[in-house]
Amino acid sequence: MSPLPRTPSARERISLQNWRERPQSTFSFHNVREFVGTQQINKSENPRHLPVDLISKTELQQAAKLADLDDFLIETETDALTILKNGCLAFDWRADHYPSEKPHIVFSISKSITGMLAGQLQHAGLLHPDRLVRDYLPDMLPEGYGSCTVQHLLDMQAAIDFDENYLDTTGAYVRYRIATMWNPPSDAAPKDEDLRTFLLSLRCSASSHGKVFRYLSPNSDLLGIVLEQAGSGRYADLLSEYVLGPLGCAHETYITVDRAGTARAAGGICLHPHDLARVGQGILDAIISGENASIPEAWIQDTLSSGNVSAWDNGEFSGLLPQGNYRNQWYISDRETPCLLAIGIHGQWLYIDLKRQIVIVKLSSQAEPVNEALDAKLIRFFSQIAKSIG
């Protein structure tokens, strides 16, 4: 008898070549370690309980001024929507394809979490953001990253000759992704080049450091390496000890690593939406109480008030947040009545309304890496919810 023809499963159709494409991403974004090397981040020994005080879907729908909330979330390719109000779980929604306990990649929200780690190491006296990168990493050359300060990395003001082009298939950005092991090897990159070697190869642009906001993910990956040197430990261990553990993160968490074990601090953190909400709530708690085991008050005040307004106004994202700013790897929505935002490609959001004590997490498997019109629409969506239920 002839064997029956075998039909490949949905999982078998996903590879390192296509894991960030939809529909593959509806599986891969919460199963990243099946495709990329990872390091575990230990969860808290004292997980934070989230009290439940739910609002109904109808209430949230009315608050957001939507005809149908489910339709909106599906249309915007949402995987999870979690809302905290005054520290309580107020709303929790999942797409059918996203199991509730799986960690989800948050892409560049990782940068903001890395910024929190930098703040904690600074508070401990281990990191000095005004020092040059080469003070921590002597192999970083002055004609490259060695000539900028750690604060330039934190604020996306390093003048480096690099183009953040997510759709690049032949240039420096695809070489960067191959170095992080997010893309399969190809002729676009030297054989066996790792992340640190790639970062060493980058050179300064014609501009000066500290003048203009220019969003470059390599800045944050290099920041992660600086933090390892300053904190005398691996990134994942430092993050668990100084940030996620004290904040009471309760679920499995991990970060992608390259072939040398270097963490992808710019975009590789995978965590549960409730734990991302705990990160946001930790910031609110620190503002309310003036102190927090993981988030120094001085770091929060510096983040809210010390950004370079001129650099932001002359930068590439000022159209999205015309009255905004960027400091310590966090977006500030409005300089007068600030909300803090952490944003990742393919639709990852952490929105913290400081005045109304609202935290909103939206994780997605959005087909496009960046959709500026949708980003603006979602900021209005978050703002409307916070104003209505806060």
Question: What positions do the PLM features span?
Answer:
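Non-transmembrane alpha-helical segments in soluble domains
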Residues: D70-L73, G119, R134, Q151-L154, ...
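Active-site SXXK
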Residues: G87, I105-D130, L153, L223-L227, ...
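Active-site-proximal alpha-helical segments within enzyme catalytic domains
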Residues: M156, P218-V226, G267-I288, Q348-S364
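Structured C-terminal helix/loop/strand segments within mature extracytoplasmic catalytic/sensor domains
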Residues: M1-E12, C339-G390
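Active-site Gly/Thr loop motif
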Residues: A250-Y254, L304-V359
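N-terminal leader/targeting segments and the immediately adjacent pre-domain N-terminus
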Residues: M1-P99, L126-L127, L154-D155, A159-E164, ...
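Active-site helix/loop module of the DD-peptidase/beta-lactamase fold
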Residues: I105, H123-Y166, S201-C204, P218, ...
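Short, charged, amphipathic alpha-helices and their helix-cap/turn boundaries
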Residues: C88-W93, R134-D135, T169-H209, G233-E252
